[in-house]
UniProtKB/Swiss-Prot annotation:
Protein's organism: Streptococcus suis (strain 05ZYH33)
Keywords linked to the UniProt accession: Cytoplasm, Methyltransferase, S-adenosyl-L-methionine, Transferase, tRNA processing
InterPro entries per record: Alpha/beta_knot_MTases (IPR029028), tRNA_m1G_MeTrfase_C_sf (IPR023148), tRNA_m1G_MeTrfase_TrmD (IPR002649), tRNA_m1G_MTases_N (IPR029026), tRNA_MeTrfase_TRMD/TRM10 (IPR016009)
Record lineage: Bacteria, Bacillati, Bacillota, Bacilli, Lactobacillales
Binding partners and assembly: Homodimer.
Function: Specifically methylates guanosine-37 in various tRNAs.
One GO term describing the cellular component: cytosol
Main subcellular localisation: cytoplasm
Entry-linked Pfam families: tRNA_m1G_MT
Binding residues for S-adenosyl-L-methionine: 108, 127-132
EC numbers: 2.1.1.228
Biological processes per GO annotation: tRNA N1-guanine methylation
Stated name of the protein: tRNA (guanine-N(1)-)-methyltransferase
Family: Belongs to the RNA methyltransferase TrmD family.
Coiled-coil parts of chain: none
Length: 241
């Protein structure tokens, strides 16, 4: 995968040189290019101006963004504008982006964008219902969530297919050594070696956690017959409590 990032602050992306994303680059599975669009600004390197019609703040000029985009080698990329008004990013979106050959992120600053910039864009994405100073932190979050889903980036595919949200449910509780710590012990089923019982326990705990913490995820969830039986049991237990 190739990722191009338009930003005024390339140095903010230093963390992408490390961890999973850095390893993906070392393996040749990922190429990341940074483009400081201030370098393409025409008037005294200014990248922003006051909005027509008045109003607070400054807007990013269209010209530096367009000229920078013209300089990037493109192979039918998804062009992503980081915008609080955009579609909310989630795991399903990350899985969708992981299938692409090229992603381009446009990171804004200041009050907003000249609307004409959006003619370059295929996706407007937000991390949530809040506003950040710029798009860089949002872009790094999306890149990390997406890159780890690229085949061969993580050693075992199960490492991410069992993640919270990948199945549509939150992940079940997990434990490691020691068996007992400060009076807290590992559930006996996990020590039993009985793989089918362990699978059923994990499924039940995953459904329980999702029901208790993120019931909204279950509104459109396609239950299997087994899951539905377990879920009805969980709801009945909750009613009794």
């Amino acid at each position: 995968m190739r990722i191009d990032i338009l930003t005024l602050f390339p140095e903010m992306f230093a963390p992408l040189e490390h961890s999973i994303v850095g390893k993906a680059r070392d393996k040749g599975l990922l190429e990341i290019n940074y483009h400081n669009f201030r370098e393409n600004a025409e008037k005294a390197r200014h990248v922003d101006d006051e909005p027509y019609g008045g109003g607070q703040g400054m807007l990013l000029l269209a010209q530096p963004i367009f000229d920078t985009m013209d300089s990037i080698e493109q192979t039918k990329p998804r062009v992503i504008l980081l915008d609080p008004a955009g579609r909310t990013f989630n795991q399903a979106y990350a899985e969708e982006l992981a299938q692409e050959e090229q992603l381009i992120f446009i990171c804004g600053h200041y009050e907003g964008y000249d609307e004409r910039i959006k003619t370059l864009v295929t996706d407007e994405i937000s991390l949530g219902d809040y506003v950040l100073t710029g798009g860089e932190l949002a872009a790094m979050t999306m890149i990390d969530a997406t890159v780890r889903l690229i085949p061969e980036v993580i050693g075992k595919e199960v490492s991410h297919t069992d993640d919270s949200f990948s199945s549509g449910l939150l992940e079940y509780p997990q434990y490691t050594r020691p068996y007992e710590y400060r009076g807290m012990v590992v559930p006996d089923v996990l020590m039993s070696g009985h793989h089918e019982n362990i699978r059923k326990w994990r499924l039940e705990e995953s459904l329980r956690k999702t029901y208790q913490r993120r019931p909204d995820l279950l509104e459109n969830y396609n239950f299997t017959a087994e899951e539905l039986t377990i879920f009805e049991k969980i709801k009945a237990e909750d009613t009794v409590d």
